[in-house]
Every structure is written in C-alpha cells, then in structure tokens.
Regions:
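A conserved mid-protein helix/loop that constitutes part of the nucleotide-sugar donor-binding site
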Residues: 17-40, 58-64, 145
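Short hydrophobic beta-strand element within catalytic cores of glycosyltransferases
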Residues: 117-120
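Conserved acidic donor-binding segment of nucleotide-sugar-dependent glycosyltransferases
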Residues: 132-133, 137-144, 153-158
C-alpha cells in the first residue's frame, strides 16, 4: 500500500515493475550501455517494465534523446535531480547500476537499505555488497546484452521474489560508520607498528 501511494504521489505507473537508477547521468556510469540494452529490449520489452532515471549530468540530454527514439520511450522516465531519493527508491522494485568503475557505491547501499534487489556490474566494491544470484545480479561491465538479460531476469517473478527475500535477510551493518571507523583504526594501529 505504501509503494502504491508513493507511486501515485510521484506520478509513476502503479502496476509496473520499476527499475531505478540513481546517480550522476554520465557515460562513465555505464548509461550509454544501458541505452544500448534498452534498444535490445525494445523488440521484446517486458510488458510490466518501467525504468526510472534519477539524477543529472552531462549525458542527460543525449540519453533522453536516444531513449525518445525507443518504441517504449514512455516507459523510461527521467525524474532529474531529486532531494528525496528514499521516496523514489521505496516506490521502485529493483535497482540498476551499470557503472564502469566503482569504489563502494553509496547508491547501492541506499538501494539495499530500501530492500531493493540490485542489478549491478561486477566492478570495484559492488561484490562486497551484492552476492550474484542471491540478493541481486552481478553482470559484466560494458555489455548491453548482459544489462538487457539482467533486466529480463528482474522482471521474472520467481527470480525477483528470491532476490527480494534474500535482500531482506542480508545484514549491511558491516558498512555502518561505526564499523568503518573500527576498520580504519585497526589499519592505522597496524601502520603505526611498522
């Protein structure tokens, strides 16, 4: 009910499977590969799929233009920069990050806190957060095919339900400020002994 109310408030389709990207809208975030994946999906677009892009950046206008040429252009929503990211996450069904380079993604951690299964590229620290096939999917970077296949899997009810159940069980406390502080202290203590 809360998700439905948020979708009405944010003017999002009520019965869609909403995948969300939150972040800078730039090519280094892999969004040109996402556009190519959407072109691949255009012929066999999952009927319930809607993608929500939240953020601004130097690729935004080009991305909007390329998506406008899709047959399913109305199913790709650009929300621009938003202050209340949590509302958009809570209104969505899964999180998407096709990034080409990543350290430890705050966006992915926020998506996990919102209990969203994640479709992310296997780069940087993403594997510390997402376990492939358990609480989401890890896909190869630079691959429109992998992104398209991952989106299809997120639209599959049984796969999605498994990820959703597991993301709710995953403990992300190891990424809390307190835990990170403890880890840094132990590194500093070790370095002082050298």
């Amino acid at each position: 009910e809360e998700k439905r109310a948020l979708r009405i408030e944010l003017n999002l389709p009520e019965n869609a499977r909403i995948g969300i990207y939150v972040g800078r809208v730039t090519k280094e975030k892999g969004l040109s590969y996402l556009v190519d994946a959407l072109k691949r999906l255009d012929e066999s677009w999952p009927p319930e799929l809607c993608l929500l892009i939240v953020g601004n950046g130097d690729y935004l206008q080009e991305m909007q233009s390329e998506c406008a040429a899709l047959r399913h252009a109305k199913r790709v929503i650009f929300a621009g920069q938003q202050e209340q990211i949590q509302k958009y996450l809570n209104a969505s069904d899964f999180f998407l990050s096709p990034s080409l380079h990543e350290n430890l993604s705050i966006s992915i951690l926020e998506a996990c806190a919102a209990k969203l299964p994640c479709l992310v590229t296997d780069v940087g620290g993403n594997g510390e957060i997402i376990t492939n096939g358990k609480n989401g999917l890890m896909i190869e970077p630079y691959s429109p095919k992998a992104i398209a296949d991952g989106i299809r899997k997120m639209c599959c009810i049984s796969t999605y339900d498994t990820f959703k159940k597991n993301i709710c069980k995953t403990d992300y406390r190891k990424f809390s400020d307190e835990q990170v502080d403890k880890q840094l202290e132990s590194v500093y203590a070790y370095l002082l002994k050298l």
